[in-house]
From Swiss-Prot:
Organism: Micrococcus luteus (strain ATCC 4698 / DSM 20030 / JCM 1464 / CCM 169 / CCUG 5858 / IAM 1056 / NBRC 3333 / NCIMB 9278 / NCTC 2665 / VKM Ac-2230)
Localisation per UniProt entry: Cytoplasm
Protein name: Chromosomal replication initiator protein DnaA
Keyword terms of this UniProt record: ATP-binding, Cytoplasm, DNA replication, DNA-binding, Lipid-binding, Nucleotide-binding
Role summary: Plays an essential role in the initiation and regulation of chromosomal replication. ATP-DnaA binds to the origin of replication (oriC) to initiate formation of the DNA replication initiation complex once per cell cycle. Binds the DnaA box (a 9 base pair repeat at the origin) and separates the double-stranded (ds)DNA. Forms a right-handed helical filament on oriC DNA; dsDNA binds to the exterior of the filament while single-stranded (ss)DNA is stabiized in the filament's interior.
Cellular component annotations (GO), alphabetically ordered: cytoplasm; plasma membrane
Gene, per the UniProt record: dnaA
GO MF term set: ATP binding; ATP hydrolysis activity; DNA replication origin binding; lipid binding
Region (Domain III, AAA+ region): 173-389
PANTHER family, sorted: CHROMOSOMAL REPLICATION INITIATOR PROTEIN DNAA
InterPro entries named in the record: AAA+_ATPase (IPR003593), Chromosome_initiator_DnaA (IPR001957), Chromosome_initiator_DnaA-like (IPR020591), Chromosome_initiator_DnaA_CS (IPR018312), DnaA_C (IPR013159), DnaA_dom (IPR013317), P-loop_NTPase (IPR027417), Trp_repressor/repl_initiator (IPR010921)
Length: 515
């Protein structure tokens, strides 16, 4: 795919804007210059880069925010990015790029260019597959260039035989934020953590399948990704694939629509570890459940590991046939309970360290004592408290935390916060109709309202990312991730955004209590 002249011209304008952006240093611009536009599909710009380091740099917060702002200004609408790797990518030979390279090299003076350390690049086939997976509705390509799973299958000693490193990182869908090292262990999750660790060290030998259940926001998804990362670190040739049940359903439907059933089977049945999240959402989807049943059987019979999460244990799952529920019980079933006070404090401490948030131990203890059931809401409370302190140039202490959280603590006897409640309250607050809120329009007010709604749906409900995108006009889950991150950051930078989120949350809580 080659970008047309209009897209190339727009990209040059975006690069020019970034050169004047204080957030993007000369070193970071060195990575920007390596990117080349491949085309614009809908509101998604396809960029190709020569290696993983460049892609990770462009996706980092510092560059991504500046890039998103520049793209929005250039195209006058919110533009998403899909960045792929192309090992054969050649730098564009244009006067402007030559001038930039000359500038980076110091021009006539011959000064040194920015010190950019680049690793070996991935293959072009990996690039095509990465683009296909990052764009909604794209057909699934079989990972033909990856080392066969059989090469990494567990041997007779119960350990997989290490295979040559593969390029399966792009197909695994693993989130780099979730590792065992960042998982806080407590009495409520110790056994689940130990089981997950054992599965990663000996796939299909320790517990197969491993079934982890518990309420939303307690760390089940974190453990799934951690299993994948640890297993791939131990056995580089291992094929791992993470998928939530809604993505599995969408991939299955697309395979039928495009008559690519064989490709779908190759993607999901030719792996060493399948990590499937929120299996309960497959309930009553007969054709999809049937396909998963056969996928499970194929993997299990070929001595491949399956790890499943759910909000309920197998026996309590409705909408599944007994033959599938019984298979969930073949291995190990373990649960995760809400964390105790000590674990909640440890979670907040680790979150504060990771995000660079300043909060004394007594403030962390106060927050942990007030929110006891949901880790996502617990971390959200910490972000609100520290954001309020930053905006008002105050020090975080118990009194400040108490003031910020006084209207946010949920009464356990109150009604459940539903998506409808959040969307209705958001529409009222911003004087928008539900149709406008879920439309494709991207005026500034609508974009802000929509992003705040996504943030609140993420924080106050148990909805998955794809489901949140679905109720807001069928948007991709990556849009939800971007909105959640954007609002978190803006709350600490802009008083208007902080006030809007706080006032809207208070109104939702008030309606929840029936006040």
């Amino acid at each position: 795919m080659v970008a047309d002249q209009a897209v190339l011209s727009s990209w040059r304008s975006v690069v020019g804007s970034l050169e004047d952006d204080a957030r993007v240093s000369a070193r970071l611009m060195g990575f920007v210059y390596l990117a080349q536009p491949q085309g614009l599909i809908g509101n998604t710009l396809l960029l190709a880069v020569p290696n993983e380091t460049t892609r990770e740099t462009l996706q980092g917060t510092q560059v991504a925010d500046a890039l998103t702002d520049a793209l929005t200004q250039e195209f006058r609408e919110e533009i998403l990015l899909a960045i792929s790797i192309d090992a054969n990518l050649q730098p564009p030979r244009t006067p402007s790029s030559e001038a930039r390279r000359s500038s980076l090299a110091g021009g006539p003076s011959g000064a040194a260019a920015p010190d950019v350390e680049l690793p070996p690049a991935a293959t072009a086939a990996t690039s095509r597959r990465a683009v296909a997976e990052e764009l909604p509705g794209f057909r699934i390509e079989p990972p033909a260039d990856v080392v066969p799973a059989a090469n990494a299958a567990p041997n007779g000693n119960g350990k997989p035989t290490p295979a040559p490193p593969s390029t399966s990182a792009e197909t695994s869908r693993l989130n780099d934020r979730y590792h065992f090292e960042t998982f806080v262990i407590g009495s409520s999750n110790r056994f689940a953590h130990a089981a997950a660790n054992a599965v990663a060290e000996a796939p299909a030998k320790a517990y197969n399948p491993l079934f982890i259940y518990g309420e939303s926001g307690l760390g089940k998804t974190h453990l799934l990704h951690a299993i994948g990362h640890y297993a791939r670190r131990l056995y580089p040739g291992l094929r791992v694939r993470y998928v939530n049940s809604e993505e599995f359903t969408n991939d299955f439907i697309n395979s039928i629509r495009h008559d690519e059933g064989a490709s779908f089977k190759q993607v999901y049945r030719n792996v060493d570890i399948l990590l499937i999240d929120d299996i309960q959402f497959l309930a009553d989807k007969e054709a999809t459940v049937e396909e998963f049943f056969h996928t499970f059987n194929t993997l299990y019979n070929n001595n491949k590991q399956v790890v499943i999460t759910s909000d309920l244990p197998p026996k309590q799952l409705s909408g599944f046939e007994d033959r599938l529920r019984s298979r969930f019980e073949w291995g190990l079933i373990t649960d995760i309970q809400p964390p105790d006070l000590e674990t909640r404090i440890a979670i907040l401490r680790k979150k504060a360290e990771a995000e660079g948030l300043v909060a004394p131990p007594e403030a962390l203890e106060y927050i942990a004592s007030r929110i006891s059931t949901n880790i996502r809401e617990l971390e959200g409370a910490l972000i609100r408290v520290t954001a309020f302190a930053s905006l008002n140039r105050q020090t975080v202490d118990i009194e400040l935390a108490e003031h910020v959280l006084k209207d946010l603590i949920t009464d356990e006897t109150a009604h459940e916060i539903t998506p409808e409640l959040i969307l209705h309250a958001t529409g009222e607050y911003f004087n928008l109709t539900l149709e406008e809120l879920t439309s494709k329009s991207r005026t500034r007010t609508l974009v802000t309202a929509r992003q705040i709604a996504m943030y609140l749906l993420r924080e106050l409900t148990e909805m998955s990312l794809p489901k949140i995108g679905q109720v807001l006009g069928g948007r991709d889950h990556t849009t939800v991730i971007h909105a959640d991150r954007k609002i978190r950051e803006l709350m600490a930078e802009r008083r208007t955004i902080y006030n809007q989120v706080t006032e809207l949350t208070n109104e939702i809580k008030r309606k929840q209590r029936g006040a």
